[in-house]
Curated annotation (Swiss-Prot):
Its EC number is 3.5.1.96. GO terms for molecular function: hydrolase activity, acting on ester bonds; succinylglutamate desuccinylase activity; zinc ion binding. The lineage of its organism: Bacteria, Pseudomonadati, Pseudomonadota, Gammaproteobacteria, Enterobacterales. It comes from Salmonella arizonae (strain ATCC BAA-731 / CDC346-86 / RSK2980). Binds 1 zinc ion per subunit. The active site is at residue 210. Belongs to the AspA/AstE family. Succinylglutamate desuccinylase subfamily. This is Succinylglutamate desuccinylase. The gene is astE. It catalyses: N-succinyl-L-glutamate + H2O = L-glutamate + succinate. PANTHER family: ASPARTOACYLASE, SUCCINYLGLUTAMATE DESUCCINYLASE. HAMAP family: Arg_catab_AstE (MF_00767).
Length: 322
């Protein structure tokens, strides 16, 4: 299966749907779905996903290179792995999404959207994770969902961790730092993301990794992703990764700015970087009689977007943790 990406983009079905690599077996499970199982027994299961947004191509190309290394035997495999290229049609079209943002649909939230290829795909991915995690009771379950961002950031690479009732595993957080993440953002409430779904329903240690700028296929400089790629290679092979000399800064979400009507105004422009700081009392947004202001001494914005559809998030406000 050395043409997984090309098959995903063309929508073709491979003539052979299962086979053997150097030290593992593989199964093609459907478009953008590939399962890898080591020959030796393992108690670790890993979801590696990319392309939930079709314009975020660098992580897809990075995973494709890792798959090539596994197939030729230059990289060993010590996890059961499900590789997911999330939104094949949007990837092929070079669009963020074709109808609606799939990363708002998980946890059966797709039922609230008009039926489309993306709602059907979200349901398919939910079932795929259920099947993957029910196959064996893995002692360790991870999910790394790889993305790139539309706008610039004061932290070039950062991670977003879903709401979780239990404390986060220190080894998992340390690996995220070793993968080059400069900041970690901790959600305090449930959401419709792929990573929240895997955490809530399967107890996975999950993180959305934002790794740089969104560019079309063929325009990515993968050298910029080398730290993350090397950390993934070491993870797959069961090797230790060197810990970061400066651990990621930590933030928590303190509020969400939501657009409810056409009267909504967000007082940030296209040049506002992720993690831009605002001081207490600053007016962030208005909608009719409602004013959104900074309530903590300092808050930092993440994903500001004044052009979102009504009912969707126009930004998150963060507080830095000690």
């Amino acid at each position: 299966m050395d043409n997984f990406l090309s098959l995903t983009l063309t929508g073709e079905t491979p003539r052979v749907t299962q086979g053997k690599g150097a030290d593992f077996r593989w199964r093609w499970l459907g478009h953008g779905l590939l399962e890898l199982t080591p020959n030796a027994p393992v108690d670790r299961a890993l979801i590696l996903s990319a392309g939930i947004h079709g314009n975020e191509t660098a992580p897809v190309e990075m995973l494709d290179k890792l798959l090539s290394a596994l197939y030729i035997g230059s990289l060993s495999l010590t996890w059961r792995v499900l590789v997911v290229f999330g939104n094949p049609q949007a990837l092929a079209a070079g669009k963020r999404y074709c109808n609606s943002d799939m990363n708002r649909m998980f946890g059966r939230r797709w039922q609230s959207f008009a039926e489309s290829d993306e709602t059907r795909r979200a349901r398919e991915l939910e079932l795929s994770l259920e099947t993957f995690f029910s196959y064996e009771q893995a002692r360790i379950r991870w999910h790394l969902d790889l993305h790139t961002a539309i706008r610039g950031s004061h932290h070039l690479r950062f991670g977003i961790l879903p709401q979780r009732d239990r404390p986060w595993d220190t080894d998992f957080l340390a690996w995220l730092g070793a993968a080059g993440l400069e900041a970690l953002v901790f959600h305090q409430a449930p959401g419709g993301t792929f990573t929240h779904f895997s955490t809530e329903h399967f107890g996975a240690l999950s993180c959305t990794l934002e790794l740089g700028k969104a560019l079309p296929f063929g325009q990515n400089d993968l050298a910029q992703f080398s730290v993350t790629s090397q950390a993934l290679s070491a993870l797959l092979s069961g090797l230790e990764t060197s810990t970061s000399s400066s651990p990621p800064l930590r933030y928590r979400v303190v509020s969400q700015i939501t657009r409810h009507s056409d009267n909504f105004a967000l007082y940030m422009d296209a040049q506002t970087l992720n993690f831009t700081a605002f001081t207490k009392g600053t007016l962030l947004a208005e909608e009719g009689d409602k004013r959104v202001t900074v309530t903590h001494d300092v808050e930092y914005v993440l994903f500001p977007n004044p052009a979102v559809a009504c009912g969707l998030r126009a930004g998150l406000m963060l507080e830095r943790l000690p």
